[in-house]
Design a protein with these regions (language model features):
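Short loop/turn segments that flank or connect secondary-structure elements
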Residues: 1-155
């Protein structure tokens, strides 16, 4: 069952704290901003946010006044993320889901000056488990995950 508004705010604050830890552990990692990972038909993959992550995305989309109307027709088969702006940047970058934060794209580059090194898998796995647990507290009947494209299709 979904919690009260105060509980939801606390759980969302916990989610943002997990995101901050993930971002810190990935400090220095970059990508070339090709937006390949934001075009699910190109990579054949897409993030599956949990219920609590979806609530955070909804909050961020509401805060910016909704999603913009697309000015151009989508490229067939591209399956572009609804959160990708026409400028190639995420419209809700600070609230992007865990999957978007953790460089699931092969284009990720390790921090400059450190040579090639692996992503911190233990920290990523721990954070993933914490988000799943948090989502179960947030919405025990339907904690997720769900395909991001299906979630945003109704926005």
């Amino acid at each position: 069952m979904r919690r009260g508004q105060d509980d939801s705010k606390k759980l969302l604050a916990e989610l943002r704290a997990i995101y901050a830890r993930v971002d810190s552990s990935l400090g220095g990692w970059t990508c070339d901003a090709s937006t390949d990972c934001c075009r699910f038909g190109v990579t054949g993959r897409e993030p599956y946010p949990t219920a609590i992550e979806i609530a955070e995305l909804e909050r961020a989309v509401r805060a910016r006044g909704g999603l913009p109307k697309r000015r151009v027709l989508p490229v067939a088969g591209e399956r572009r993320c609804a959160l990708l702006g026409d400028d190639g940047k995420c419209l809700v970058y600070a609230s992007r889901p865990f999957g978007c934060r953790t460089f699931y794209c092969e284009r990720a580059k390790s921090p400059v000056g450190e040579g090639v090194r692996a992503l911190p898998k233990n920290e990523i796995n721990d954070a993933s488990r914490a988000i799943v647990d948090l989502s179960a507290k947030f919405d025990a009947r339907n904690p997720g995950p769900r395909p991001l494209s299906k979630v945003t299709a109704t926005w």
